[in-house]
Amino acid sequence: VTITFADLTTMRVGGPVGRLLVPESMSQLVDALHESAGSDDPLLVMGGGSNLVVGDIGWHGTVIKVGSSELDVDGERVTAAAGVDWDHVVRVSLDQGLAGLEALSGIPGAAGGTPVQNVGAFGTVTSDVLESLLVFDRTTGDLERWPADRCGFGSHRQSVFKRSDRWVVVEVTFRLRRSEQSRAIEYADLANRLGIEVGGTAAPADVRQAVLELRRSRGMVLDPRDHDTWSVGSFFVNPVLADVPERAAECPRYFDVKGTKLPAAWLIERSGFPRGYGREWGNGTVSLSTRHALSVTNRGGATASDVMKFAAHIRDGVEARFGIRLGPECDLVNCSF
């Protein structure tokens, strides 16, 4: 039976996998990485497949799908193997009375992917709470313990792991706090859902519940029966600009260390692409989510090529309207737009 990336990713597109390895422990993962380091076979390492689109030609080398499951709580530190389901990490930390991850509830994927993307939601980003990580260096074959500040977290969704495939995350350690209150809630949608003022706090478990409700309402919690969740979540990155074009003067804006961050969903909808757009475009297999304009979705039967053509169509429309070029937030392998 040929395994394809349509079987392994939440977008459910992509061609065949050459050779698939699924290590179920950290030691098996390190062994598999050592083996691949001595081979000329191209290597692709993936976690939950929730932020990955692979082209229709697939990947003809080796794919390591990380399945390691070790999880340890020691005081205010939570250490997770790269393959642990991310939402399980959030749940366990809250069950242990630890606050800090609640705003990241419901995000699909594995723990090892969080520093790669510097995953964030509702005002919390991985780099806020990550203390250290165990990394495999594919060049030297060494395991290295890194402090979080070595990850090269810069602007939105960036890290050294996005810029090079030399290092593979094997384990992550978060420093949380024992608290009955969340950090200040700065997002109006979340504050409204919690019934508090912006800038107020709430019980971490209540924040988790509110975040899950908001994510479900936007089609951002995986459900195989719901085509709005056949996606990578946010497909486009929110652009960060030194200067906002006059045409985008009315766009909401947020502070970022590198400039002004604009919500890509606002730009997309104001460029003539409402939620659900695309069912009448092309062959109808790809559309924006009916609940969130930032999410490109597979309506059933789409190919990676269909997804790329549709993404280019949205990107070009936004650029024509506002002079701002959107790029992908997800990882694209053997495909582009």
Describe each region flagged by the PLM.
Residues 1-144:
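Anion-binding (especially nucleotide phosphate/pyrophosphate-binding) glycine-rich loop
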Residues 3-10, 143-306, 321-337:
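Phosphate/pyrophosphate- and phosphate-bearing ligand-binding catalytic cores of soluble enzymes
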Residues 29-34, 90, 191, 208-211, ...:
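A generic alpha-helix structural signal
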Residues 95, 304-310:
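Beta-rich strand-turn-strand
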